Swiss-Prot record:
Protein name: Protein FAM149A
Disulphide bonds in the chain: none
Entry's family note: Belongs to the FAM149 family.
Ranges annotated as biased composition (Acidic residues): 174-186
Top-level taxon of origin: Eukaryota
Residue numbers spanned by region Disordered: 18-155, 173-210, 232-264, 568-613
Record field: compositional bias (Low complexity): 18-37, 54-90, 245-264
Length: 773
């Protein structure tokens, strides 16, 4: 294909160069016309000897005839012609204007029927030229080739009938007919002609698919073609189908405008008009080739192009080289990405492709090893010459390879390696498959047809499977329903026999207040003891009977023990009453409740009640002061001393607080560095107030109540000392304690400094003690 396009380009270039030369003078004799034609052919120098070019003939006796739109004299009932011939004929119109401005052109003659063994494509040339100026110029081949076995020789015939004698020049048949005859003659034809015959969805009658598979695809292709053509025409450029017409019109318009001299009709074209005309013709040709390859449209122009390519592939030898790039690129910023193993035309590994090659004339080169091609039995041509064609057609249908005359491998340079390419390269290569990027659905026509066929096949197979398994499924369901009915009857009989066992058991469980699952569990266990195998089989295989699956049962309320209710109520009372009377009366109640916890009812012991911590708001206020210093434990006695107004600061109410520990600690640290600190919040610091308490029973009662309160109250983990760690000093009497306090001496250090907060607390204690006494 590439070589054909290059040959077409070189042909156009040479013809354009020839068009700039002045044409030869006309001849008044037929022999002179033939000679001129021969000289014109030698000047044209066309490389394709089998594609002659016809130049315009002049009409007789038309001195004042005006120039009309040029039209070629190529008349074909099938409108088929070589692409090179069409291009040359189009260029030939540029050379159709004679040197004399009086000369005109006659209208094209109507097509004549074929006869006398002539080809359908004929050139109509007047055999009797006019007497006036003018003649026939024909670019005949300079070195014509010998006709092949499937070609017809270039000849001439005269059409019978009245009127002027007409000479018919016959073109060689290297188009569709020649390619078809050559392909049917020998089975070695490869290339575009072979793929052209097998391209499309209705290729041959024996391999054609039903129309309902390809109907949607064909509609989509037609819709896309209409849209593309409309967008192409709306963009301002000429459509590919009307390129030739617009080109001829522009040629006529440009030739009539501007300065025109005796020999300057051709030179009235500017350089940009030449470039525009050539670009339009090449664009039209490429558009037709693209439609043929990707959309399956084969028109007469592309049909002739396929025939030319088939002729070119028949007369040229091919060498297929398979291998890898051994020398990595050394350019800066370019990195080589190793792709998959290079495959042949049918995307197979090199060795397998060489081993199953279908053409003995091919040479496979894989690396540095030359493997001769071997024909398989299936690839050998049979009597109808379809072995090679079927193999190639099958491979092209499978892998969507249209035509292969070589392999082009593209290398892309990236600054960094992309993730998608890395994932694709890490996957193991599978022979006979092409890698596609994930996320892209198959949108080509052949993939859509393959999906439609696969869906149809699946539906057909699934329908057959359902028909085969229908009887088996029906038998299975009948067996299951029969067993289910038997099991339901067995359960009903078991329920009628033992109704008194199930009901009292359920009532007993409901009275004690278990969760709803306990009664159901007991019922299931009883039924399992009655008939264990049948019950298990029923629960595992039969689910149509929903009796007993869900049970709604009333659950009795679980009451809280009286201990917690009274405790919450007392906490509220303590908050409401801030005086000492409520605090004094709360201790006996708490002691009584502590003893009552051992005598709770068995029903309360049966259900484990989660232990809940008391509220932090009430307990934090109660536990800030040790229980030893509260009025519940220590009861002060007013002694008849001279210092009545100086009461003991240790006798206080339950809601009084000590001064901040930080200030006292700082004072102690600064006063006596080596002295051991004693916390006021300890529970066993009763050695300071032993003299204020009666001896004997009061001390024993204090110990018992202290132990009971320690067990019930929340433990303090901040400053807790054991009794062995508590420093014991000599006890002070009330008189000595009051004297020390009055004179300002410290109890712990003996210094004269007393904090102000401690003095204020002492006065508050005295006032409260007098009121409560």
């Amino acid at each position: 294909m590439k070589a054909a396009v290059l040959d077409l380009g070189s042909l156009l270039a040479k013809l354009f160069e020839t068009s700039t030369a002045p044409p030869a003078g006309p001849s008044s004799r037929p022999s002179g016309g033939a000679a001129a034609a021969g000289s014109g052919g030698s000047r044209a120098g066309t490389p394709l000897g089998t594609a002659p070019t016809l130049l315009r003939a002049l009409a007789p006796d038309s001195p004042s005839a005006s120039r009309r739109s040029p039209a070629p004299l190529l008349s074909s009932p099938y409108s088929r012609g070589s692409a090179a011939s069409r291009a040359a004929g189009a260029v030939g119109t540029l050379l159709s204007w004679p040197s004399s401005p009086r000369a005109g052109k006659a209208p094209p003659q109507p097509p004549t029927p074929s006869g006398g063994g002539c080809s359908p494509a004929r050139l109509v040339v007047p055999a009797r030229p006019p007497s006036g100026p003018g003649g026939v110029w024909a670019a005949l081949p300079r070195n014509p080739l010998q006709p092949g076995p499937g070609e017809r020789e270039l000849g001439a015939c005269v059409a019978p009938g009245a009127g002027p004698r007409t000479l018919f020049l016959t073109l060689p048949d290297i188009g569709e007919e020649g390619a078809s005859d050559g392909d049917s003659g020998d089975g070695e034809a490869r290339g575009l002609s072979e793929g052209r015959r097998r391209h499309g969805f209705t290729v041959r009658s024996k391999d054609s698919l039903p129309t309902h598979f390809t109907r949607n695809v064909q509609k989509a292709i037609d819709k896309y073609t209409c849209k593309s053509l409309s967008s192409f025409s709306s963009s301002g450029s000429h459509t590919p189908t009307g390129a030739h017409t617009s080109w001829s019109g522009s040629a006529t318009q440009s030739s009539t405008t501007g300065s025109s001299t005796e020999r300057g009709s051709v030179y009235s074209w500017r350089d940009d008009e030449f470039d525009e005309a050539s670009s339009q013709s090449v664009q039209r040709l490429l558009w037709e080739v693209e439609e043929m390859l990707f959309e399956g449209k084969v028109n007469p122009q592309t049909q002739s192009l396929l025939a030319e390519c088939g002729e070119w592939t028949r007369r040229s030898l091919h060498l297929r080289v398979l291998g890898r790039q051994l020398i990595l690129p050394t350019d800066k910023g370019v990195q080589h990405f190793q792709g998959s193993t290079p495959a042949s035309a049918v995307h197979r590994p090199p060795l397998s492709a060489c081993g199953h090659s279908s053409n003995i004339r091919e040479l496979c080169i894989s690396g540095s090893q030359i493997v001769p091609a071997a024909l398989s039995a299936s690839a050998l041509p049979g009597p109808d010459d379809t072995g090679v064609a079927d193999l190639t057609a099958r491979s092209s249908l499978e892998e969507e390879v249209y035509h292969v005359d070589g392999k082009i491998e593209e290398y892309f340079a990236f600054d960094r390696k992309e993730d998608d390419d890395e994932c694709l390269e890490q996957k193991p290569a599978q022979p006979g498959r092409k890698w596609r990027k994930l996320g892209l659905p198959p949108v080509s026509p052949r993939d859509c047809v393959k999906d439609a066929v696969a869906a149809e096949v699946f539906d057909h197979v699934w329908t057959n499977m359902v028909e085969l398994l229908e009887e088996l499924i029906r038998k299975h369901w009948e067996t299951t329903l029969t067993e289910g009915k038997k099991q339901r009857e067995t359960l009903k009989v078991a329920g009628n026999r033992f109704p008194h066992v199930l009901v009292p058991h359920a009532h007993a469980d409901g009275a004690s207040g278990p969760p709803s699952g306990h009664a159901e569990a007991h019922g299931i266990s009883l039924a399992s003891r009655l008939n264990p195998p049948q019950i298990h089989h029923f629960s595992s295989s039969f689910y149509s009977d929903m009796n007993g699956v869900m049970t709604i049962q009333a659950k009795p309320l679980q009451r809280r023990p009286a201990y917690f209710a009274d405790r919450t109520q007392n906490e509220k009372e303590d908050k409401a009453s801030g005086g000492g009377a409520g605090a004094l009366s709360s201790a006996p109640h708490r002691l009584g409740r502590a003893s009552d916890t051992h005598g709770l009812s068995p029903s309360a012991k049966k259900t484990p009640v989660p232990w809940r911590l008391p509220s932090l708001a009430s307990d934090s206020q109660r536990l800030k002061t040790p229980n030893i210093y509260s009025d519940e434990v220590l009861r002060g006695t007013k002694l008849p001393t001279g210092v009545d107004h100086m009461a003991s600061p240790l006798v206080q109410t339950s809601r009084s607080r000590f001064p901040p520990l930080v200030t006292e600690t700082r004072g102690q640290n600064t006063a006596v560095p080596g002295c051991r600190l004693v916390s006021y919040r300890g529970r066993h610091l009763q050695n300071r107030v032993l003299s204020a308490m009666p001896d004997g029973t009061e001390r024993s009662r204090l110990r018992e109540r202290t132990a009971t309160l320690e067990r019930l109250s929340r433990p303090s983990t901040t400053h807790t000392f054991r009794q062995s760690d508590t420093p014991r000093k000599s006890s002070l009497t009330q008189m000595e304690f009051a004297a020390h306090t009055w004179t300002g001496q410290s109890i712990l250090t003996g210094s004269q400094y007393v904090p102000k907060s401690f003095q204020r607390t002492t006065l508050t204690f005295k006032r409260r003690f007098q009121v409560t006494s």
